[in-house]
Amino acid sequence: MEISGWGRYPKIDAEVILPKTGSACASALKDPGLLIPRGLGRSYGDSSLASTVLETTELQYFQEFDPETGALACDAGVSLYEILNVFIPQGWFLPVTSGTRFVTVGGAIASDIHGKNHHVDGTFCEHVLSFDIALGNGEIVTASPTQNLDLFHATCGGMGLTGIIIAARIRLKPITSSDILETTIKAPNLDAVLDGFEKYIGSTYSVAWIDCLAKGADLGRSLLMIGEHATDGGLKVSSKKPITIPMDAPTQLLNPLTIKAFNALYYGKVLQTEQSRRTSFETYFYPLDQMLHWNRLYGKPGFLQYQFVIPTATGREGMRRILEEITESGQGSFLAVLKAFGKQNENYLSFPVEGYTLALDFKVTPSIFKLLDRLDELVLQYGGRLYLAKDARMTELTFKASYPRWQEFEAVRSKYHAIGKFASLQSKRLGLA
């Protein structure tokens, strides 16, 4: 069957295996040949693509929950959406969440997802107590911060290349309201929004929408959104049905003129320098989940999400230079999200380092690849790197120059029988065995 990542580029024909139990996952590994595990397919590029794909979505059961500690044990195919639906009414929330709820627990670990609170709470895997993983030889073992630590650090952020996560134990955090108290600050330029991140470093959540086509004195103008959990107002999950994008949009829908017009309207909708509101967790964390199949907006060719991080020391200069490159190209991004990262963790391939990260969506066109190659050069020049969960075209040279622990990662893969069993289109492109 034809499959792709969320960006719908590239698309390939693959054999898809759907085991219903962890032991069935392990049994599937006895067959010769390479494969890659896959959850709900929300990584954007080719990290979960291979000629043989093992989907974990049938591993979908909750196992145990401790209301005293918030420790949840569940199958790896359980989604963040399902966790929120079950546990928000009981007063619990995810410790870290990505910009979509439609991610499996296994996928969240494999990508070591981050959220709007990285500067406070780190990545998802920093709240993982342990997981069970089927190795390339069919053995099922447990990895945690106290057991098989090297396997734990390699699997967290390891893009499914160490084995098949079949179950996990994570720690949820208590809340007394499902609502978010949001303050939006209008930042007239890049320096102002980066100053805002520093000013609100003690806030639990922070994220900025950035106008990537603004030039001159307006370069980097943004809306910075600060969030805190409300303490009253009930614990509820919306029953409102999302709208559906029914078909591919015309390829000319998103172009520099429409993006520029949208950006002007979006920035202009905030009339005051600072304004506050109470909003639902769905609106604050998952605005795009309100549109099913929103990836169709980019048309049949698909799109590339380009997310990079630049360390704090070079962050301002690097961000400015990259934004200038984008505005000069005229190839703007319809969605541009800026966040501040806290300290780096010990996982070999986890993306975040302390600094600033920007995520951009670009429609697939013949000219976009040249621009992204140029942005790669700038990211490396300023000491940054790209997010593997979003990547579909990074070179081996760029990867190995920006992820200095890749050889340690490969050594752990060899130790735990992953080499010769787990591989994706991405891992082959990046020169991993």
Locations of regions flagged by a protein language model:
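Noncatalytic alpha-helical scaffold of FAD-dependent oxidoreductases
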Residues: M1-A433
